[in-house]
């Protein structure tokens, strides 16, 4: 959806701005967040597997955090979920590490449809 594109672009710009201001790396500031993470990881010589695990864990943690705040899930249950997902995150990072660019992508059809609907609502807690 439009808001997911905006979110990824804004996160990328903020991340790159932080990199430019705090380290001697003049990374392009007009990058989507996942691309910015990859470029910075390469520049700072972060091993690909560790970079993928950190990125995926951050993504999953953000989703769990929404659940903690709005289900309500509770922090202890959220931590248990994250711990239980660590092997899945590591497995997915290993798959991504050996994948060719044409094999990478994502599909979250129902989530994307919900996002498109959600961005047209008047009263929302979060951007989509």
Where are these regions (language model features)?
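Amphipathic alpha-helical interface segments
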Residues: 1-73, 80-83
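C-terminal auxiliary extensions adjacent to catalytic cores
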Residues: 58-128
């Amino acid at each position: 959806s439009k808001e997911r594109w905006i979110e990824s672009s804004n996160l990328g710009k903020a991340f790159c701005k932080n990199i430019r201001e705090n380290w001697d790396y003049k990374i392009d500031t007009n990058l989507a967040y996942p691309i910015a993470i990859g470029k910075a990881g390469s520049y700072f010589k972060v091993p690909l597997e560790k970079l993928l695990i950190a990125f995926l864990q951050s993504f999953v943690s953000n989703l769990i955090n929404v659940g903690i705040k709005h289900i309500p899930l509770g922090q202890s249950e959220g931590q248990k979920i994250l711990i239980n997902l660590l092997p899945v995150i590591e497995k997915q990072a290993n798959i991504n590490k050996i994948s060719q660019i044409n094999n990478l992508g994502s599909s979250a059809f129902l989530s994307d449809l919900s996002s498109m609907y959600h961005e047209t609502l008047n009263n929302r807690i979060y951007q989509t």
